[in-house]
């Protein structure tokens, strides 16, 4: 196995810059401080943040809107009087307790309306709900008891757990828990050398499970929460997120809660303050203009051509951070770029899937649960959040036409499975069919015991992510999501490239979690910034890069497993 394929996230970051072979390379000058960042999602804004704080002159080019997939945006023609337009979004934002890089950045962004930080405006989440269909008991999950658990909640949770576990074949549950233990006690060598190359489905022995077990133990983690397919994604990538979630839920490694949500629509609470702070540091933003091609000269990027409705020009800088999503980065790999760094051809092998959202604006408050709701049995892998309960503003008084009191935001993780109303996958449905289908799938879980939760009259309007375009009977997606598959770590790039002044940032770049997350995007933005610092000869301190939580109690098991892996032996518990 190559050294590249065995690099871990901590190796991949570094501050070293690979030199290209066979090409003359111009050396940087001591005053080379100009940086162009292409893309203003979390990765690009993070790189701009870290570099601007260290005295670099940063210009950010963004083809659509600041914030990328993480932004919120106004619903067109939804306001009346002095109110704002209703909030829409690509998908609701949730910051799990095991995130480290993103919370650190949020603590360094001043809010716009007080003397606190953006992080101070995050609302703790201590529980979530597995909503079941066909009369099965919903399963509330509590990460910790202090301050949030009522006697009624504990009674319901205990009864639901007992019913669910009675329905699960004990042998299958033991197998699943054993497989989790195998992963959590596996060495880094085995994770990257063995578990990277088998699917999560095969790793947990999903083919031996009942359909009920697969829904609860496999699909609920993969499709519903991270838009990954258990039969395609590697055991290493899914296992990494699974163990991180376990450590957060048990408070072994957490920022204080199992997760947090914002106290207002995302851009108002986070993206707008972030952009304002970056502007105060001298960052310049050019919106509506995207990169078309990099130009190469003497082994370095000499310019990037950017275009927009009224713009078509070359932009020169000393350093370039490409922070666009992988499907956009692939378009920038011209023959000249690949000649300068042939390893970047691997980007063509990376894949994307669809995970987009729809918001239902309701006439009545509908706090279904004071945390995310995972519709385990929904074929489209739905997860919802009733957001008005967490926002520090009056939705009815401040937004829309004065009748909307709730924003029920729903993420759709599976666009390929047939629905329950039209029998078609989401990617084949018209927007109104998607809205009807999503409501039906939620009602199948929320109203399966006879109670009415989502009556027809309560829905004032709905808004589908505008990245989904339905034209001439065909759906397209302008903002798909990077997904892992077995062996994809080997073809994921590092933040530093063999082109000395080109750096990559985005959730497809190697990082700790190995999944499409805001945390991973933030980490790669830091890694790209550190690459610029190293290559420019800057004496500024590097951006902090955190290591994943590694329980000391498991260290001896992992050392033993590393020795067994080097000798070609299986994990000591890998007998099931």
Predicted regions and their residues:
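Extreme N-terminal leader/targeting segments of oxidoreductases
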Residues: 1-35, 53-54, 552-576
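Core beta-strand elements of the Rossmann-like FAD/NAD(P) dinucleotide-binding domain
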Residues: 31, 310-319
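Active-site/ligand-binding neighborhood in enzyme catalytic cores
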Residues: 173-298
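C-terminal segments that line or cap access tunnels to active or ligand-binding sites in enzymes
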Residues: 251-262, 305, 317-319, 324-492, ...
């Amino acid at each position: 196995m190559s050294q590249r394929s065995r690099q871990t996230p901590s190796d991949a970051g570094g501050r070293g810059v690979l030199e290209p072979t066979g090409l003359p390379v111009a050396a940087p000058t001591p005053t080379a401080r100009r940086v162009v960042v292409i893309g203003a999602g979390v990765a690009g804004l993070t790189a701009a943040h870290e570099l601007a704080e260290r005295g670099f002159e940063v210009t950010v080019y963004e083809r659509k809107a600041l914030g990328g997939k993480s932004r919120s945006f106004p619903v067109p023609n939804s306001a009346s009087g002095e109110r704002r337009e209703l909030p829409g979004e690509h998908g609701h934002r949730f910051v799990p307790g095991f995130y480290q890089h993103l919370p650190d950045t949020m603590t360094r962004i001043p809010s716009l309306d007080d003397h606190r930080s953006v992080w101070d405006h995050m609302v703790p989440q201590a529980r979530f709900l597995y909503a079941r269909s066909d009369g099965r008991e919903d399963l509330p999950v509590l990460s910790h008891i202090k301050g949030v658990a009522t006697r009624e909640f504990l009674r319901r949770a205990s009864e639901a757990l007992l019913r669910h576990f009675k329905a699960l074949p004990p042998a299958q549950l033991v197998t699943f828990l054993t497989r989790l233990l195998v992963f959590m006690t596996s060495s880094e060598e085995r994770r990257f050398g063995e578990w990277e190359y088998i699917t999560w489905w095969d790793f947990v022995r999903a083919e031996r499970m009942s359909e009920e077990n697969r829904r609860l133990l496999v699909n609920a983690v993969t499709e519903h929460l991270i838009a990954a397919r258990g039969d395609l994604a590697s055991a290493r990538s899914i296992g990494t997120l699974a163990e991180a979630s376990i450590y957060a839920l048990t408070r072994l490694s957490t920022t204080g809660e199992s997760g947090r949500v914002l106290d207002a629509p995302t851009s108002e609470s986070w993206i707008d303050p972030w952009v304002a702070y970056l502007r105060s540091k001298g960052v310049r933003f050019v919106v509506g203009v995207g990169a078309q091609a990099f130009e190469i000269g003497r082994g370095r990027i000499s310019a990037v051509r950017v275009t927009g409705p009224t713009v078509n020009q070359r932009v020169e800088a000393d350093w370039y951070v490409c922070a666009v999503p992988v499907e956009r980065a692939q378009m920038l790999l011209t023959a000249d770029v690949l000649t300068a760094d042939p390893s970047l051809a691997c980007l063509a092998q990376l894949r994307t899937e669809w995970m987009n959202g729809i918001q239902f604006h309701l006439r009545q408050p509908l706090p279904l649960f004071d945390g995310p709701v995972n519709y385990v049995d929904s074929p489209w892998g739905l997860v919802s959040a009733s957001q008005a309960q967490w926002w520090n503003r009056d939705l009815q008084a401040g937004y829309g036409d004065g009748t909307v009191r709730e924003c029920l935001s729903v993420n759709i993780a599976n666009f390929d499975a047939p629905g329950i109303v039209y029998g078609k996958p989401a990617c084949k449905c018209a927007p109104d069919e998607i809205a009807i289908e999503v409501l039906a799938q939620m009602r199948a879980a929320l109203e399966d015991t006879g109670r009415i939760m989502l009556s027809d009259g309560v829905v004032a309007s709905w808004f589908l992510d505008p990245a989904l375009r339905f034209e001439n009977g065909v759906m397209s997606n302008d903002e798909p999501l990077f997904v892992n598959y077995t062996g994809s770590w080997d073809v994921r790039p590092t933040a530093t490239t063999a082109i000395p002044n080109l750096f990559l940032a985005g959730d497809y770049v190697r990082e700790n979690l190995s999944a499409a997350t805001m945390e991973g995007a933030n980490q790669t933005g830091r890694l790209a910034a550190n690459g610029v610092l190293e290559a420019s000869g800057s004496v500024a301190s590097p951006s902090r890069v955190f290591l994943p939580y590694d329980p000391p109690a498991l260290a001896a098991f992992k050392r033993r497993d590393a020795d067994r892996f080097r000798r070609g032996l299986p994990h000591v518990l890998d007998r099931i």
